[in-house]
Swiss-Prot record:
One of its GO terms (molecular function) is ribosome binding. This is Ribosomal protein arginine N-methyltransferase rmt3. S-adenosyl-L-homocysteine binds at residues 239, 263, 285, 287, 313-314. CDD domains: AdoMet_MTases (cd02440). Residues 217-543 form the SAM-dependent MTase PRMT-type domain. The gene is rmt3. Belongs to the class I-like SAM-binding methyltransferase superfamily. Protein arginine N-methyltransferase family. One of its GO terms (biological process) is methylation. Methylates (mono and asymmetric dimethylation) the guanidino nitrogens of arginyl residues in ribosomal protein rps2.
Length: 543
């Protein structure tokens, strides 16, 4: 009997049918063919007749790695994710169907950003919920039968005489086909549901005339799903070592404590806390990167200490009432860009114990005046001559946007001043939108070309611990021109009008931060200033 793999049925059908009725008819016809050709070769609609050395792609249960051999996949899971399929199967005495459920259970948990609980397998595998394939055409499921048959042959030490070996082969094949049939029926039901949802959505869209609200959150979380952004952040030694040193130098406040990591990303801060002795770390993220964070925890033997939860901090619940410490790297350009501080403050109000600690404990926005003739003017002067053409109209956008770049310390022409402080234990979401006064004294004569701002970050081990005015490595880190450059760089507000100022001239004014009305993750900045009795102002958008 020539048996064509079930995964191929599904592939062929999806090329030929376009409606749910077509799917149902295709299933009926295909299994009718199978039943009427029990001992002969089947005509597969002129598809390939011979299925020799077919190459399968086996996807890892925990990460994006793929393999062409199932045994290689299990070896990878054991080495990279501390999951021994053969040991789990043997210890729990799992049969063919239970192994199917095990694979689907693990895939479903990883997809939801959760850590699979293998200690409760007996209860979990009683449900038929995990007979439904998580991945379409999951080669692991379709090859488990061969895997288990192979195990049986390896373990069988008795020679048994079989009158008709073909009958045993057919029985095994029938068993496998029944399972594959059940899987396909489950997949068909999912397709049916998806199709109905699609039709319902289309109908709703046709009836509705109300413009859809921009989904800025989805775009935001998707932007943190890839490796590049995390490479940039982790490679920032000032940032990463600042957090690491705070945790490792203060292991006494983490030992035996419960920690919440808001926006865990790759899980680096959670792993720092676990290594420092935290009893439990709850790592929350709403981006696909959480799947890699789970893999990272498994790989480093920290999966028992860290529980990953996928979702918005505003929506999720924790297995515990309160936590002892909340840690988060939430800072954006100009500190509040992307508005992640809002989520951290929500987490504090929902989950932090009254005596709990926020890490970092305080952040400060800092402003200075900048003088230069080259670096800061480059994005403006570029448009004066573009391959022989004038494009001066393009200059306007450069004055409306915030230029994020590394500013040399030599361009700083006034003693920096703090214009906003955020005590993370007490501040409120509404405090993030503000207007603050500032006063700068010019150090050397020259044109006032721009205002430049950055932020400083402070860590404390107690809620009431005094915070020094000066920033140093012992208490935190700076993102200013005087320090080692970071991926945050500095934010430059270029001025249209550039008055020439003498040494000692005072520049006074106000600076305002507010959320952009079109996208609340973008940042609007307005500056009003007065020099020698002459007032001026300018507004910017950081997006």
């Amino acid at each position: 009997m020539l048996v064509k793999p079930m995964a191929c049925y599904f592939e062929i059908w999806t090329r030929k049918v376009t409606t749910i009725e077509d799917f149902s008819l295709a299933i009926a016809n295909r299994f009718k063919q199978m039943g009427s050709h029990s001992d002969s070769e089947v005509d597969w609609d002129n598809e390939e007749e011979v299925w020799e050395d077919e190459v399968h792609e086996f996807c890892c249960l925990f990460c994006d790695s793929t393999f062409t051999c199932l045994k290689d996949l299990w070896s990878h899971c054991k080495e990279a994710h501390n999951f021994d399929f053969y040991q789990v199967k043997q210890q729990n005495n799992l049969d063919f169907y239970a192994c199917i459920k095990l694979v689907n259970y693990i895939r479903s948990q990883v997809k939801e950003g959760k850590t699979p609980d293998l200690d409760k397998l007996s209860d979990i595998l009683r449900s038929d919920e995990y007979m439904i394939s998580v991945l379409p055409d999951d080669s692991v499921l379709f090859s488990l039968g061969d895997e288990l048959d192979s195990d049986f042959e390896d373990d069988n030490t008795l020679e048994i005489e079989v009158e008709n070996p073909a009958d045993v082969s057919k029985d095994a094949e029938i068993k496998k086909l029944k399972l594959q049939n059940q899987l396909l029926i489950s997949q068909l039901e999912e397709i049916r549901k998806d199709k109905m949802n699609e039709l319902t959505s289309q109908t709703t869209d046709q009836l509705s005339v109300t413009p859809k609200k921009a989904d800025n959150d989805s775009y935001y979380f998707e932007s943190y799903a890839g490796n590049d952004i995390h490479f940039l952040m982790l490679n920032d030694s000032v940032r990463t070592e600042g957090y690491r040193d705070f945790v490792y130098h203060n292991k006494h406040i983490f030992a035996g404590k419960t920690v919440l990591d808001v926006g865990c990303g790759t899980g680096i801060l959670s792993m720092f806390c676990a290594k420092a002795g935290a009893k439990k770390v709850y790592a929350v993220d709403n981006s696909d990167i959480i799947q890699m964070a789970i893999s990272n925890a498994f790989e480093n033997g920290l999966a028992d200490q860290i529980t990953f939860i996928r979702g918005k901090i505003e929506d999720i619940s924790l297995p515990v009432g309160k936590v002892d410490i909340i840690i988060s790297e939430w800072m954006g350009y100009a500190l509040t860009f992307e508005s992640m501080i809002d989520s951290v403050l929500v987490a504090r109000d929902r989950f932090l114990a009254p005596s709990g600690i926020m890490a970092p404990s305080e952040t400060r926005l800092v402003l200075t005046a900048t003088t230069n003739t080259e670096l800061l003017e480059e994005p403006i002067d570029f448009w004066s001559d573009v391959y022989g053409f004038k494009m001066n109209g393009m200059k306007d956008a450069s004055y409306k946007g915030v230029s994020v770049q590394v500013v040399p310390q030599t361009y700083v022409n006034a003693k920096p001043v703090v214009f906003a402080r955020f005590n993370m234990h007490t501040c409120k979401v509404q405090d993030v939108s503000f207007t603050s006064p500032f006063s700068l004294i010019i150090d050397n004569e020259g044109p006032l070309c721009a205002f430049t701002l950055w932020f400083d970050t402070y860590f404390t081990t107690k809620r009431t611990q005094p915070i020094p005015e000066a920033i140093d490595e012992a208490c935190g880190f700076t993102t200013g021109p005087q320090g080692t450059p970071t991926h945050w760089k500095q934010c430059v507000l270029l001025l249209r009008n550039r008055p020439f100022l003498q040494k000692g001239t005072r520049v006074e004014g106000t600076i305002s931060f507010s959320k952009n009305k079109k996208n609340n993750r973008d940042l609007d900045i307005s500056v009003h200033w007065n020099v020698n009795g002459k007032a001026d102002s300018q507004s910017y958008v950081l997006n």
